[in-house]
């Protein structure tokens, strides 16, 4: 596996991640306006990442190819790893940001919540999904999305961005709604956490570093 990283500016990142299973390029601008272009070869995942970038107000470009003819797992997880790496790089030294964010997102019968701390200490808690999501496939294309991957996505994002991320489903029935509400909750929590805080000029930590 090879990974190359190039910082364009303090709030931007470009990540290239290549393995025998996938080839991924991500461009991220935290100070964007929600301009998103995603092509992973997994249509439902494209839909989820588009929602994430749009509702976080990030400018996000994702180009990924992988062994989806075997199964989408590798491409989905590797893309989440690269996205987390890009987020961590774009945050830089985290001076002047709010650091914490949280959001409740309803989607019809579903309610999801996400809370984030851009702490530099990677941790993910993912809870509340109904048991049937362990065995649900969202099809509609030749490359389906298995909802059991949701936890892997959030864990990979948190680990590689080095953030604490808590995602929970309070209630819901429809697998599409449950999945999408979680992605949107994470997006809105991140949007809040990365925002500049006009009252903070340094790193938002009593330790002086994150």
Swiss-Prot record:
Q: How is the cofactor bound?
A: Binds 2 manganese ions per subunit.
The positions annotated for binding Mn(2+) 2 are 73, 77, 152, 177
Entry's InterPro entries?
Answer: IGPD_sf (IPR038494), ImidazoleglycerolP_deHydtase (IPR000807), ImidazoleglycerP_deHydtase_CS (IPR020565), Ribosomal_Su5_D2-typ_SF (IPR020568)
Q: Where in the cell is it found?
A: Cytoplasm
Q: Residue span of the signal peptide, if any?
A: none
The coenzyme or cofactor needed here is:
Mn(2+)
Q: What's the top EC group for this one?
A: lyase
Highest taxon of source: Bacteria
What's in the keyword line of the UniProt record? Amino-acid biosynthesis, Cytoplasm, Histidine biosynthesis, Lyase, Manganese, Metal-binding
- Identify the EC number(s): 4.2.1.19
Give the reaction(s) catalysed. D-erythro-1-(imidazol-4-yl)glycerol 3-phosphate = 3-(imidazol-4-yl)-2-oxopropyl phosphate + H2O
Key word ATP-binding present: no
PROSITE patterns the record matches: IGP_DEHYDRATASE_1 (PS00954), IGP_DEHYDRATASE_2 (PS00955)
Q: How is its activity regulated?
A: Competitive inhibition by 3-amino-1,2,4-triazole (e.g. ATZ).
An annotated GO cellular component: cytoplasm
The entry marks the following residues as binding Mn(2+) 1, namely 47, 74, 176, 180
Keyword Manganese listed = yes
Give the main location.
Answer: cytoplasm
- GO MF term set: imidazoleglycerol-phosphate dehydratase activity; metal ion binding
| GO biological process entries | L-histidine biosynthetic process
Q: Which residues are listed for substrate binding in this entry?
A: 21, 47-55, 73-77, 99, 121, 176-184, 205-207
Q: Which PANTHER family match?
A: IMIDAZOLEGLYCEROL-PHOSPHATE DEHYDRATASE, IMIDAZOLEGLYCEROL-PHOSPHATE DEHYDRATASE HIS7
State the family it belongs to. Answer: Belongs to the imidazoleglycerol-phosphate dehydratase family.
Q: What is this protein called?
A: Imidazoleglycerol-phosphate dehydratase
Q: Native species of this protein?
A: Mycobacterium tuberculosis (strain ATCC 25618 / H37Rv)
């Amino acid at each position: 596996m090879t990974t190359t990283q190039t910082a364009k500016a303090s709030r931007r990142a470009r990540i290239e991640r290549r393995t025998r299973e996938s080839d991924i390029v991500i461009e991220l601008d935290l100070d964007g306006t929600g301009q998103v272009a995603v092509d992973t070869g997994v249509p439902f995942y494209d839909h989820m990442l588009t929602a994430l970038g749009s509702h976080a107000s990030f400018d996000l470009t994702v180009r990924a190819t992988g062994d989806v003819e075997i199964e989408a797992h590798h491409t989905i997880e590797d893309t989440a790893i690269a996205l987390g790496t890009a987020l961590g790089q774009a945050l830089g030294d985290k001076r002047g940001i709010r650091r914490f964010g949280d959001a409740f997102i309803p989607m019809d019968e579903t309610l999801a919540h996400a809370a984030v701390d851009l702490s530099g200490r990677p941790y993910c808690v993912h809870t509340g999904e109904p048991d049937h999501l362990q065995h649900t496939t969202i099809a509609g294309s030749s490359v389906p999305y298995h909802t059991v991957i949701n936890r892997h996505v959030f864990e990979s994002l948190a680990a590689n961005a080095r953030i604490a991320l808590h995602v929970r489903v309070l209630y819901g029935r429809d697998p599409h709604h449950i999945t999408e509400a979680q992605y949107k909750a994470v997006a809105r929590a991140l949007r809040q956490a990365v925002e500049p805080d006009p009252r903070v000029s340094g790193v938002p930590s009593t330790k002086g570093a994150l």
